[in-house]
Amino acid sequence: MAKEVFQRTKPHMNVGTIGHVDHGKTTLTAAISIYCSKLNKDAKALKYEDIDNAPEEKARGITINARHIEYETANRHYAHVDCPGHADYIKNMITGAAQMDAAILLVAADSGAEPQTKEHLLLAQRMGIKKIIVFLNKLDLADPELVELVEVEVLELVEKYGFSADTPIIKGSAFGAMSNPEDPESTKCVKELLESMDNYFDLPERDIDKPFLLAVEDVFSISGRGTVATGRIERGIIKVGQEVEIVGIKETRKTTVTGVEMFQKILEQGQAGDNVGLLLRGVDKKDIERGQVLSAPGTITPHKKFKASIYCLTKEEGGRHKPFFPGYRPQFFFRTTDVTGVVALEGKEMVMPGDNVDIIVELISSIAMDKNVEFAVREGGRTVASGRILEILE
């Protein structure tokens, strides 16, 4: 069956659901999908099971990898990533967050903000997300007086992490909206959320004029066609027939793009902001991996050693309880990848939680990097610092 061509009629935006495990992120994502499919006859409704689609997730009822769905409102086309809330999987949330222009923060009204609520807010801020909308979920299970307290608490948190005091708060029950899609009262919260997204989220300015770059998130083999690399185009435009370089981790090599797709539809060209799959000529699945980038030839190079400015989280923010010293070996997260690195300090003997400091890092493998790129520093499954590259040393 021939694939349909993706029609670019509305502005495209990437959003995602973030928040603590079991606060209802996947349920809300399913409720939105079902609601939009009722408005648009071409749209496909995805149920909870379709979004939570890995066997281990079904058994545990949690989302591990970020999942993508698409839907349209009156004004926009959204790609929506459902981010995992489980602590072990925050790493995957980072790659999900790296693809979002704006986020919907889910907080269960019956339990309020929890540790991961804070960690996700911090990650959203570090990943450059400027605006969020709060969805206060499980309203049917919460005492009305408690809801008011939770609302105040969440707004304080949102402001603490640099988001606006005017952040909209939508209240409702995602489960109610998902279970009763025909009932206007149940789906009112989803309708309000989508209107709020259209009005409050600013369409991002896309770096279409810069050289092409895509951070590889996943790699698949399609029998008879070759290898597909998926990810979000960070900048530039890509068309069939263009040559690209695979950079980072291994030797840099060239290949040609033989197909561009988004949500199983063919694209005439992929552009900055699109989540795409690129079919690559003559590349074996083992030749390319998550964490590498595809780029316009000669525009980005792999490096191991750099100078960076970092902020160390305090104990209260979920960071370390004790200082770290030269020789510290955490993981550094760039775009979609984590690499172990060794820290050297200049003119300092140690770094305390809460410090802003410049460090020198040497990674154990080369990563495609450029100046000003932001990264997260993680250790033992938690974020301990965030930083930005000041200069590349080698």
Curated annotation (Swiss-Prot):
What's this protein's name? Answer: Elongation factor Tu
From the UniProt record, report the name of the gene that encodes this protein.
Answer: tuf
Spans annotated as G1:
19-26
Which EC number(s) does the record attach to this protein?
3.6.5.3
Task: Name all tr-type G domain ranges.
Answer: 10-205
Enzyme class (EC, first level): hydrolase
User: According to its UniProt record, which protein family does this protein belong to?
Assistant: Belongs to the TRAFAC class translation factor GTPase superfamily. Classic translation factor GTPase family. EF-Tu/EF-1A subfamily.
Q: Where in the cell is it found?
A: Cytoplasm
Region entry G2, spans: 61-65
